[in-house]
Amino acid sequence: MVRKTLKNKPLVEAIFELRWALQKVAPGMKIDPHYWIAVGRIDDRLQVDYPFHEQLPTASIPNEIAGYVVQHRFRKGEGQWPLVQLGPGIITVNDTEGYHWADFEKQISRTIGALFEAYPGGESALKVNDVVLRYINAIAFDI
């Protein structure tokens, strides 16, 4: 099948997001008990595809209130796309202008494989509770 690329495609960003259950430690407080171990181990596994690691300012948020907040970003190079984002209970794969479904699907598959490999206890320790594929489009209007 021939890949057709639109000249002026409206896609701004494609986002794959996977969330898993957090552990309740107190009323209103949930944590990912293996998050800090997983960050380093996922970084190791993503190095080939995403060697540039950014720790985001949100990484300073206390663990008890940081659930589902992205704290680390892995890129091919500074400011480059696609990218992978990670936080307690959440991992995303994002792409923009270079988006093609076949490539994006492979990136998702490799990223999820890295997560399941890196997370202490593996796939059985993660209780996936949400998987989302989202597209953000923009169309210019002359008003």
Which residue stretches match the model-derived regions?
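N-terminal low-complexity, intrinsically disordered segments
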Residues: 1-86
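Aromatic/basic-lined ligand-recognition segments
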Residues: 1-3, 71-75, 127-143
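Conserved aromatic-histidine-acidic binding/catalytic patches
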Residues: 4, 96-103
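Glycine-rich, often proline-containing surface loops adjacent to acidic residues and nearby aromatics
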Residues: 10-17, 81-99, 127-134
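Beta-strand elements of well-folded, non-transmembrane domains
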Residues: 20-24, 97, 137-139
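Intrinsically disordered, low-complexity acidic/polar segments
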Residues: 25-27, 102, 142
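Short, surface-exposed linear patches
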Residues: 38-40, 97, 114-117
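Secondary-structure boundary elements
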Residues: 102, 106-127
